[in-house]
Amino acid sequence: MPGVKKQFQESENSSKPPYFFGHMYGGIGAVINQGSSFFCIPLDMNIQDGLKETDSWKQGSCHDAASHVVQMIRNGYEAADTFGSSYLVLDRYFLTVPALTELNQLNQSAHLLDVITRAKSSCIAYEIPKADRTPRRGRPRKKGEPIKLNTLFEDRASDFISAEIMMYGKKETVQYLCLDLLWGTKLYKKLRFVLVKYAKSSAILVSTDLSLNPVLIIEAYAHRFKIECTFREFKQQIGGFCYHFWTKAMPKLNKNKKKTDASELP
Protein backbone atom coordinates (compact mmCIF):
# COMPACT_ATOMS: atom_id res chain seq x y z
CA MET A 1 0.00 0.00 0.00
CA PRO A 2 1.41 3.44 -0.88
CA GLY A 3 2.72 5.65 1.89
CA VAL A 4 3.95 2.89 4.21
CA LYS A 5 7.27 3.81 5.82
CA LYS A 6 9.39 2.81 8.76
CA GLN A 7 8.27 4.96 11.69
CA PHE A 8 9.75 5.69 15.10
CA GLN A 9 7.87 6.55 18.25
CA GLU A 10 9.21 6.45 21.79
CA SER A 11 7.49 3.77 23.84
CA GLU A 12 7.84 2.62 27.43
CA ASN A 13 5.60 -0.38 26.73
CA SER A 14 7.53 -3.57 25.90
CA SER A 15 4.61 -4.84 23.80
CA LYS A 16 4.89 -1.83 21.47
CA PRO A 17 8.21 -1.62 19.59
CA PRO A 18 9.73 1.83 19.02
CA TYR A 19 10.25 1.07 15.31
CA PHE A 20 7.38 -0.12 13.14
CA PHE A 21 6.01 0.13 9.61
CA GLY A 22 2.89 2.15 8.96
CA HIS A 23 1.36 5.39 7.74
CA MET A 24 2.20 8.78 9.19
CA TYR A 25 -1.03 10.68 9.70
CA GLY A 26 -1.33 14.32 10.59
CA GLY A 27 -4.55 15.72 11.95
CA ILE A 28 -5.93 18.95 13.36
CA GLY A 29 -9.11 19.60 15.31
CA ALA A 30 -11.06 22.41 16.93
CA VAL A 31 -11.32 22.44 20.73
CA ILE A 32 -14.86 23.25 21.87
CA ASN A 33 -16.41 23.18 25.30
CA GLN A 34 -19.75 22.45 26.92
CA GLY A 35 -19.74 23.83 30.42
CA SER A 36 -16.53 22.65 32.04
CA SER A 37 -15.96 19.82 29.53
CA PHE A 38 -13.74 20.25 26.49
CA PHE A 39 -13.78 18.20 23.29
CA CYS A 40 -11.73 18.08 20.10
CA ILE A 41 -13.72 17.99 16.85
CA PRO A 42 -11.54 16.65 13.98
CA LEU A 43 -11.25 19.00 11.01
CA ASP A 44 -8.60 17.46 8.78
CA MET A 45 -6.54 14.26 8.66
CA ASN A 46 -4.21 13.06 5.92
CA ILE A 47 -1.08 11.02 5.22
CA GLN A 48 1.84 13.43 5.33
CA ASP A 49 4.86 11.31 4.48
CA GLY A 50 5.81 8.52 2.08
CA LEU A 51 3.88 9.75 -0.98
CA LYS A 52 6.84 10.85 -3.07
CA GLU A 53 7.04 7.63 -5.10
CA THR A 54 3.32 7.44 -5.88
CA ASP A 55 3.31 11.08 -6.96
CA SER A 56 6.05 10.27 -9.47
CA TRP A 57 3.62 7.93 -11.25
CA LYS A 58 1.50 10.82 -12.47
CA GLN A 59 2.22 14.14 -14.09
CA GLY A 60 1.49 17.43 -12.39
CA SER A 61 1.68 16.03 -8.86
CA CYS A 62 -0.30 18.02 -6.33
CA HIS A 63 1.81 16.76 -3.42
CA ASP A 64 4.96 18.77 -2.81
CA ALA A 65 8.10 17.77 -0.95
CA ALA A 66 7.29 19.85 2.14
CA SER A 67 7.89 18.12 5.45
CA HIS A 68 4.93 17.05 7.58
CA VAL A 69 5.89 19.81 10.03
CA VAL A 70 5.33 22.43 7.34
CA GLN A 71 2.18 20.66 6.12
CA MET A 72 0.70 20.87 9.62
CA ILE A 73 1.26 24.64 9.68
CA ARG A 74 -0.45 24.94 6.30
CA ASN A 75 -3.41 22.85 7.45
CA GLY A 76 -3.76 25.01 10.54
CA TYR A 77 -3.72 28.19 8.45
CA GLU A 78 -6.42 26.81 6.14
CA ALA A 79 -8.61 26.15 9.19
CA ALA A 80 -7.91 29.65 10.53
CA ASP A 81 -8.90 31.08 7.15
CA THR A 82 -12.36 29.58 7.77
CA PHE A 83 -12.76 30.15 11.51
CA GLY A 84 -10.86 33.41 11.84
CA SER A 85 -7.88 34.26 14.03
CA SER A 86 -6.80 31.05 15.80
CA TYR A 87 -4.14 29.38 17.91
CA LEU A 88 -2.57 26.14 16.70
CA VAL A 89 -1.42 24.03 19.66
CA LEU A 90 1.32 21.54 18.77
CA ASP A 91 3.68 19.25 20.64
CA ARG A 92 7.41 19.90 20.96
CA TYR A 93 8.23 18.10 17.71
CA PHE A 94 6.93 21.10 15.77
CA LEU A 95 9.17 23.81 17.21
CA THR A 96 11.42 24.05 14.17
CA VAL A 97 12.84 26.80 11.98
CA PRO A 98 11.00 25.56 8.83
CA ALA A 99 7.68 25.62 10.71
CA LEU A 100 8.17 29.18 11.95
CA THR A 101 9.41 30.31 8.55
CA GLU A 102 6.29 28.91 6.89
CA LEU A 103 4.12 30.56 9.55
CA ASN A 104 5.76 33.93 8.87
CA GLN A 105 5.17 33.60 5.13
CA LEU A 106 1.51 32.61 5.52
CA ASN A 107 0.78 35.44 7.95
CA GLN A 108 2.18 38.08 5.59
CA SER A 109 -1.06 38.25 3.60
CA ALA A 110 -3.30 38.11 6.69
CA HIS A 111 -2.23 37.39 10.27
CA LEU A 112 -4.65 34.59 11.15
CA LEU A 113 -2.58 32.00 13.00
CA ASP A 114 -0.33 31.84 16.05
CA VAL A 115 1.36 28.73 17.40
CA ILE A 116 1.57 27.45 20.96
CA THR A 117 3.97 24.57 21.44
CA ARG A 118 6.52 23.08 23.78
CA ALA A 119 10.30 23.33 23.65
CA LYS A 120 12.78 20.57 24.34
CA SER A 121 14.54 20.58 27.70
CA SER A 122 17.82 21.29 25.89
CA CYS A 123 16.40 24.39 24.17
CA ILE A 124 18.70 27.41 23.89
CA ALA A 125 17.30 30.90 23.30
CA TYR A 126 18.99 34.29 22.98
CA GLU A 127 18.57 37.59 24.71
CA ILE A 128 17.34 40.52 22.68
CA PRO A 129 20.46 42.54 21.73
CA LYS A 130 20.76 45.96 23.27
CA ALA A 131 21.22 48.91 20.98
CA ASP A 132 24.71 50.40 21.05
CA ARG A 133 24.89 53.83 22.62
CA THR A 134 27.45 54.95 20.09
CA PRO A 135 27.25 54.04 16.38
CA ARG A 136 29.67 51.33 15.26
CA ARG A 137 30.80 50.02 11.91
CA GLY A 138 29.14 46.88 10.58
CA ARG A 139 25.64 45.47 10.78
CA PRO A 140 23.72 45.51 14.08
CA ARG A 141 23.78 42.40 16.24
CA LYS A 142 20.95 39.96 15.51
CA LYS A 143 21.06 38.20 18.88
CA GLY A 144 22.29 38.64 22.40
CA GLU A 145 23.78 36.19 24.88
CA PRO A 146 22.61 32.56 24.71
CA ILE A 147 20.46 31.20 27.55
CA LYS A 148 20.00 27.54 28.43
CA LEU A 149 16.37 27.70 29.44
CA ASN A 150 16.46 24.54 31.52
CA THR A 151 18.95 26.13 33.93
CA LEU A 152 16.51 28.94 34.77
CA PHE A 153 14.35 26.59 36.85
CA GLU A 154 17.07 26.79 39.52
CA ASP A 155 18.91 30.00 38.67
CA ARG A 156 15.76 32.14 38.75
CA ALA A 157 13.59 30.08 41.08
CA SER A 158 12.74 33.17 43.15
CA ASP A 159 11.25 34.92 40.08
CA PHE A 160 8.57 32.29 39.45
CA ILE A 161 4.94 33.34 39.96
CA SER A 162 2.32 31.03 41.51
CA ALA A 163 -1.13 30.64 39.95
CA GLU A 164 -4.12 28.28 40.00
CA ILE A 165 -4.92 26.91 36.55
CA MET A 166 -7.44 24.43 35.17
CA MET A 167 -5.38 21.57 33.74
CA TYR A 168 -6.76 18.24 32.56
CA GLY A 169 -10.12 18.84 34.20
CA LYS A 170 -8.95 19.93 37.64
CA LYS A 171 -7.36 22.89 39.35
CA GLU A 172 -3.60 22.75 39.64
CA THR A 173 -1.22 25.09 41.42
CA VAL A 174 1.63 25.95 39.09
CA GLN A 175 4.61 28.25 39.10
CA TYR A 176 5.70 30.00 35.94
CA LEU A 177 8.29 32.40 34.57
CA CYS A 178 7.57 34.36 31.39
CA LEU A 179 10.36 35.63 29.11
CA ASP A 180 10.41 37.10 25.60
CA LEU A 181 13.53 35.82 23.84
CA LEU A 182 14.92 35.11 20.37
CA TRP A 183 15.01 31.57 18.99
CA GLY A 184 16.05 29.74 15.83
CA THR A 185 19.40 29.52 14.06
CA LYS A 186 19.62 32.33 11.47
CA LEU A 187 15.93 33.08 12.11
CA TYR A 188 16.12 34.63 15.60
CA LYS A 189 12.38 35.07 15.88
CA LYS A 190 11.06 36.73 19.01
CA LEU A 191 8.96 34.24 20.99
CA ARG A 192 7.28 34.14 24.37
CA PHE A 193 8.73 31.39 26.58
CA VAL A 194 6.83 30.22 29.66
CA LEU A 195 8.74 28.00 32.07
CA VAL A 196 6.24 25.97 34.11
CA LYS A 197 6.64 23.95 37.29
CA TYR A 198 3.71 21.81 38.45
CA ALA A 199 3.60 18.82 40.81
CA LYS A 200 6.94 17.07 40.22
CA SER A 201 7.16 18.04 36.55
CA SER A 202 8.43 20.97 34.54
CA ALA A 203 7.95 22.18 30.98
CA ILE A 204 9.01 24.99 28.65
CA LEU A 205 6.09 26.32 26.60
CA VAL A 206 6.39 28.67 23.64
CA SER A 207 3.98 31.09 21.95
CA THR A 208 4.41 33.15 18.80
CA ASP A 209 1.84 35.62 20.20
CA LEU A 210 3.88 37.97 22.38
CA SER A 211 0.77 39.56 23.89
CA LEU A 212 -0.80 36.32 25.15
CA ASN A 213 -1.11 35.93 28.92
CA PRO A 214 1.21 33.19 30.27
CA VAL A 215 -1.70 31.58 32.15
CA LEU A 216 -3.66 31.25 28.90
CA ILE A 217 -0.63 29.69 27.21
CA ILE A 218 -0.46 27.02 29.92
CA GLU A 219 -4.21 26.34 29.77
CA ALA A 220 -4.18 26.18 25.96
CA TYR A 221 -1.34 23.66 25.88
CA ALA A 222 -3.16 21.49 28.42
CA HIS A 223 -6.00 21.17 25.89
CA ARG A 224 -3.63 19.66 23.30
CA PHE A 225 -4.18 16.24 24.85
CA LYS A 226 -7.80 16.32 23.63
CA ILE A 227 -6.71 15.40 20.11
CA GLU A 228 -5.15 12.22 21.53
CA CYS A 229 -8.60 11.38 22.91
CA THR A 230 -10.04 12.02 19.44
CA PHE A 231 -7.58 9.55 17.86
CA ARG A 232 -8.50 6.96 20.51
CA GLU A 233 -12.25 7.34 19.92
CA PHE A 234 -11.72 7.35 16.15
CA LYS A 235 -9.99 3.99 16.44
CA GLN A 236 -12.05 2.28 19.14
CA GLN A 237 -15.56 3.58 18.40
CA ILE A 238 -15.57 4.13 14.64
CA GLY A 239 -12.92 1.64 13.55
CA GLY A 240 -10.56 4.16 12.02
CA PHE A 241 -7.02 2.98 11.20
CA CYS A 242 -8.28 -0.64 11.44
CA TYR A 243 -6.84 -1.85 8.15
CA HIS A 244 -3.92 -3.95 6.95
CA PHE A 245 -1.43 -2.49 4.53
CA TRP A 246 0.08 -5.86 3.59
CA THR A 247 -1.09 -8.98 1.74
CA LYS A 248 0.34 -12.42 0.94
CA ALA A 249 0.20 -11.58 -2.76
CA MET A 250 2.89 -8.94 -2.29
CA PRO A 251 6.60 -9.82 -1.99
CA LYS A 252 8.02 -9.72 1.52
CA LEU A 253 9.49 -6.40 2.55
CA ASN A 254 13.27 -6.27 2.63
CA LYS A 255 14.05 -4.38 5.83
CA ASN A 256 17.69 -3.98 4.80
CA LYS A 257 16.89 -2.48 1.42
CA LYS A 258 18.78 0.66 0.46
CA LYS A 259 17.36 3.60 -1.44
CA THR A 260 19.61 2.80 -4.41
CA ASP A 261 18.34 -0.81 -4.71
CA ALA A 262 15.84 -1.71 -7.42
CA SER A 263 12.16 -1.99 -6.50
CA GLU A 264 10.88 -5.44 -5.55
CA LEU A 265 7.61 -4.78 -7.38
CA PRO A 266 7.28 -5.96 -11.01
Which residues does each PLM region occupy?
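Active-site-proximal, Lys/Arg-enriched surface segment
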Residues: 1-49
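Single, function-defining residue in the core of a domain
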Residues: 35-266
